[in-house]
Amino acid sequence: SETGTGQSMYNIMDYTNTNITGTSLILERLLKSGNTIEHFILSSSRSIYGEGAYLSSNNQPVSKNLKRKIEDMKLGKFDIYCPETGNAMKAIATNEECIPNPLSFYAATKLFQEQQMNLYKEKLFRKLTIFRFQNVYGEGQSLNNPYTGLLAVFFNLANENKSLNVFEDGLESRDFIHVDDVVATIKCSIFSNNRSWDGTFNLG
């Protein structure tokens, strides 16, 4: 897949050709072959959730149509606000039942990949596992692409006594997962005969 939320907003055709058209070609070839795949694993992304889940003023989980307003951010207000009361809401864990709310073209392509695969699931796959990865890090990552190697970029800047530019109010949070843990989980899903791996899972 092409990856990177910011880049996707202006490299639209690159992301379309790779993430959407590429997936379409795989499905079309499988349909023409007449074969059924025992187990297919799709690498998706936590970005499909957008801002993720929040707790509203009446203590109800909210995830639908959440988006920070540009005018608020210009005033230094980076919270998500309750649509009913206007009060800042608290971020909570985002589970797999959270309503997707893609806020970038990249996220939209990953969600569409999931929909493509699920549409043909009964016809093509005996078992379909979709992993929605958090930020994956590990040895060998690119030091030039901040979308794939943020920790490596920060480490190298700190090692060179350079400033780490963190925007907003410094209270941002990110969930990271090491590539070894990703590989271990994928291997577990591959070598397990358990049908519980037939579904969609957050990983990170």
Residue positions per predicted region:
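Short beta-strand segments
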Residues: 41-44, 130-138, 168, 200-204
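A general structural signal marking secondary-structure boundaries and capping sites
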Residues: 7, 30, 34, 52, ...
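Alpha-helical substrate-binding/gating segment
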Residues: 122, 136, 152-165, 174-201
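N-terminal Rossmann-like NAD(P)+-binding domain of SDR-like oxidoreductases, especially those catalyzing
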Residues: 1-134
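Short, flexible active-site loop motifs that bind/organize anionic cofactors or intermediates
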Residues: 5, 13, 172, 203-204
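Glycine-rich "substrate-gating" loop/helix at the edge of Rossmann-like oxidoreductase active sites
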Residues: 103-106, 134-148, 168-180, 194
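Short, electropositive, low-hydrophobicity segments enriched in small/polar residues
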Residues: 10, 26, 54, 111, ...
